[in-house]
Amino acid sequence: MTVYESLMIMINFGGLILNTVLLIFNIMMIVTSSQKKK
């Protein structure tokens, strides 16, 4: 495995973690907004 390939894997893995964090953040925002409406 070259340095470039390992770097690309690191970037892809970091993007996956970032997407997961954003997804959880969006779900939390929806839950809090729905609780305020009640």
UniProtKB/Swiss-Prot annotation:
Keywords: Cell membrane, Membrane, Toxin-antitoxin system, Transmembrane, Transmembrane helix. It comes from the Bacteria. One of its GO terms (cellular component) is plasma membrane. Encoded in the SPbeta prophage; retention of this TA system may prevent the bacterium from losing SPbeta from its genome. The chain crosses the membrane at residues 11-31. This is Small toxic protein BsrG. Toxic component of a type I toxin-antitoxin (TA) system; expression in the absence of cognate antisense antitoxin SR4 RNA leads to cell lysis. Induced expression causes membrane invaginations that dislocate the cell wall synthesis machinery, leading to eventual death. Unlike many type I TA systems it does not form pores. Base pairing occurs between the 3' UTRs of bsrG mRNA and SR4 RNA, which leads to initiation of degradation by RNase III (rnc) followed by the action of RNase Y (rny) and RNase R (rnr). Not toxic when expressed in E.coli. Disruption phenotype: Non-essential, it can be deleted. The gene for the antisense antitoxin SR4 RNA cannot be deleted. It comes from Bacillus subtilis (strain 168). The keyword Cell membrane applies. It is found in: Cell membrane. InterPro entries: BsrE-like. It is a single-pass membrane protein. Induction: Accumulates by 4 hours post-innoculation and into stationary phase in rich media; maximum expression occurs at 6 hours. Low expression early in rich and minimal medium, higher expression after. The antitoxin antisense RNA SR4 is constitutively expressed at a constant level in all growth conditions and media tested. bsrG mRNA levels decrease rapidly upon 48 degrees Celsius heat shock. SR4 RNA not only base pairs with bsrG mRNA promoting its degradation, but also inhibits its translation as it sequesters the Shine-Dalgarno sequence. Its main location: membrane. Changing residue 5 to K: No longer toxic.
